[in-house]
């Protein structure tokens, strides 16, 4: 765990955790992603502000800080399709084989509702300049159980010719 004092600096330890979270997202491992997001949320967010979308969005950006190696800075409330995606990661020009990552956050509605919103509001349409894969990531926080759930789907976007 990155908060333990084992002789390494905390930043290096956390960057390893962040790489593991990014790997879980890339591999489509929703269970592992949710578990790790929950740990970061618990460690970095005050219990006073815990049940709020901004706190969860900031948690995601902290958890995926290692993505800066491969992606532009995350864009909050990215205008796309018929609405605004909560967070979008666009790959750097030097990383053309990396997928775009679209993250939608929900409270007490289930991760499937987040994925449905991405599809129903046609968020991927605004990302059609990317001819590769788009990862749709839905993350939900259940206030009663205090559990995070995640659903990850792959979407292939074919750029207009």
PLM region spans:
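Low-complexity, intrinsically disordered Gly/Pro/Thr-rich segments
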Residues: 122-126, 132-140
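Extended alpha-helical interface modules used as scaffolds for assembling large macromolecular complexes
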Residues: 1-114, 120-122, 133, 147-161
